[in-house]
Regions:
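Basic, helix-initiating cap at the start of DNA-binding domains
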Residues: 1-43, 60
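Amphipathic alpha-helical segments that line or abut small-molecule/effector binding pockets
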Residues: 14, 87-102, 131, 135, ...
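Short hydrophobic/aromatic patch on the recognition helix
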Residues: 45-55
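Short amphipathic alpha-helical segment with a characteristic S/N-K-E followed by hydrophobic residues
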Residues: 57-62, 73
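Short secondary-structure transition hinges
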Residues: 60, 98-135, 160-168
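Hydrophobic alpha-helical connector segments
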Residues: 64, 77-103, 121
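All-alpha amphipathic helical-bundle segments outside canonical DNA-binding/catalytic cores
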Residues: 124-128, 142-157, 169-174
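C-terminal peripheral helix-coil segments that are non-catalytic and often amphipathic
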Residues: 131, 135-143, 161, 165-188
């Protein structure tokens, strides 16, 4: 792919991610949501034809956004783990996880279709999140802040539970409180 084409592709993915973040806010306010490819193209400052050249379907674009945002979330973990005490760093990263989940809600039925088709797998997502959580736990155990008997996979399962068990009318606030409880439960 030529450099200019790769740059435009990245612009489209970034614009779609930003649009989904805006839609997640709208969804929390009860507004109807649906990703508009015209709005994504305008936000990316490319023509609709350019968008479709790189992403022939809405699902292809959303899959690229999903993978990019998951990579960004997971890649941020080691640096964040090294930048603050383990409990504070892990909670800050968990809040980023909430942002990731919020933007996925805006994908709605499209995300369900991608999971059903196998384009996105829960196993891969969970494995990547588990790998990302490990540095926080290792740093916390080494500092005497966290218990040593909790595997990263259990933390990921509890994070998902906190998000999906929260009352829809207070989704973000309750999820944040549940994640703070999870941090308290990890303490030595």
């Amino acid at each position: 792919m030529r450099a200019d084409a790769a740059r435009k592709r990245e612009q489209v993915v970034a614009a779609a991610g930003d649009e989904l973040a805006d839609l997640a806010v709208a969804a929390r306010n009860g507004e109807p949501i649906r990703l508009s490819l015209d709005k994504v193209a305008a936000r990316a400052r490319v023509g609709v034809a350019t968008l479709y050249r790189h992403f022939p379907t809405r699902e292809a674009l959303l899959e690229a956004v999903y993978h990019q945002e998951l990579t960004r979330l997971c890649d941020a973990a080691p640096e964040l783990a090294a930048s603050a005490p383990a409990d504070e760093a892990l909670l800050a990263w968990m809040y980023r996880y909430l942002d990731f989940v919020d933007s996925k809600r805006a994908m709605g039925l499209d995300l369900r279709a991608m999971v059903a088709s196998g384009a996105i797998t829960q196993a891969n997502t969970r494995a990547r999140l588990t790998t990302a959580v490990a540095p926080f736990l290792e740093a916390g155990v080494a500092a005497g802040v966290f218990r040593s008997d909790v595997p990263p996979d259990d933390v990921v399962a509890a994070m998902a539970g906190a998000v999906f068990a929260a009352d829809p009318t207070q989704q973000r606030d309750q999820s944040q409180r549940l994640l703070a409880l999870l941090i308290d439960g990890l303490r030595a």
